Amino acid sequence: MRIQSLLLLGALLAVGSQPPAAFGRKKGEKPGACPPDDGPCLLSVPDQCMEDRQCPLTRKCCYRACFRQCVPRVSVKLGSCPEDQLRCLSPMNHLCHKDADCSGKKRCCSSACGRDCRDPVRG
């Protein structure tokens, strides 16, 4: 019984010592996020990568227009963007490009008319 208790304690300590970011990521997925993909697909070219581990250093494998390539990652704030129920009648206008462009805990979220800074929702 004592050996089983020690093994269980060791397993719990191993899991508890993992950084929180490790949970929720696929194996081989690097931390951070892909930058927004605003480019139109003008020319179909072969993917340069299929997953993050094929990219050097801290770069991530992300869609850019219509193919995947290794790009610098961006940091992401906690929470998720609220769902947008609107339709846009004017041209797109981006007030931010990444979370770091927004103050405090606000996130750079896509809306019907572009991206803007919004308070995140839990999730």
Swiss-Prot record:
Molecular function GO labels: serine-type endopeptidase inhibitor activity
Compartmental location: Secreted
Chief place where the protein resides: secreted
Alphabetic keyword roster: Disulfide bond, Protease inhibitor, Repeat, Secreted, Serine protease inhibitor, Signal
Annotated signal sequence range: 1-24
Domain WAP: 27-73, 74-121
Disulfide topology: C34-C62, C41-C66, C49-C61, C55-C70, C81-C109, C88-C113, C96-C108, C102-C117
GO annotation, biological process: antibacterial humoral response; innate immune response
One Pfam match: WAP
GO cellular component terms attached to this protein's record: extracellular space
Biological role: Putative acid-stable proteinase inhibitor.
Name this polypeptide is given: WAP four-disulfide core domain protein 5
Record lineage: Eukaryota, Metazoa, Chordata, Craniata, Vertebrata
